[in-house]
């Protein structure tokens, strides 16, 4: 309301407001949702967001005030793409796919897609743009079906949050460093999944 002077609904077009991690993007200039459009965060004018591409291939490059460069949706895997019953498919959300610091260290992200929902699947780190050396480190997220699915609608397409996190593994190459196992109970009042236990394994040790 503060920026738009109204509380209108989503139109799923170029005039909808854009947000980065919940913060409103403010256009610099009159160009919006076109290749090369520039935005800033509403509470951080020193973080610049540049739009690249067109239509279903749009992605965003974020340059932060502390020297990091982040990419959102520059891979097909990191986009929530919706195919409505009428009209063209469109991207509803762009997820982080890469982060690089000012020294060239970088991380990449990949996602599991199911029922319109994206779940973080692998985070890879330990490499540097300026050297050929570096560790091949990964954090892997493993999911299971949840009995308390959470349905939702994007335009006329139904999605569902149907997975919950079962375990997390951290590795260097093929060597397992740590494994976390999550257990759940069901809330007797709401019927919702409730985290009840986390077990951690490192080498042959375990603890609760």
Regions found by a protein language model. Name each.
Residues 1-208:
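Conserved catalytic cores of ATP-dependent inositol ring kinases
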């Amino acid at each position: 309301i503060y920026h738009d002077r109204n509380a209108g609904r989503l139109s799923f077009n170029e005039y909808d407001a854009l947000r980065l991690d919940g913060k409103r993007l403010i256009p610099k200039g009159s160009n919006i949702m076109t290749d090369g459009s520039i935005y800033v965060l509403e509470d951080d004018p020193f973080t610049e967001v540049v739009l690249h591409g067109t239509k279903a291939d749009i992605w965003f490059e974020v340059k932060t005030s502390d020297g990091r460069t982040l990419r959102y949706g520059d891979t097909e895997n990191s986009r929530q793409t919706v195919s409505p019953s009428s009209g063209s498919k469109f991207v509803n959300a762009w997820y982080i796919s890469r982060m690089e610091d000012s020294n060239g260290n970088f991380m990449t992200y990949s996602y599991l897609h199911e029922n319109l929902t994206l779940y973080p699947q692998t985070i890879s780190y330990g490499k540097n743009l300026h050297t050929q050396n570096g560790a091949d480190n990964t954090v892997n997220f493993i999911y299971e079906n949840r009995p308390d699915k959470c349905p939702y609608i994007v335009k006329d397409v139904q999605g569902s949050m149907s997975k919950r996190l079962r375990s997390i593994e951290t590795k260097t190459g093929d060597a397992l460093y740590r494994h976390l196992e999550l257990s759940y109970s069901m809330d007797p009042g709401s019927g919702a999944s409730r985290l009840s236990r986390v077990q951690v394994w490192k080498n042959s040790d375990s603890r609760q």
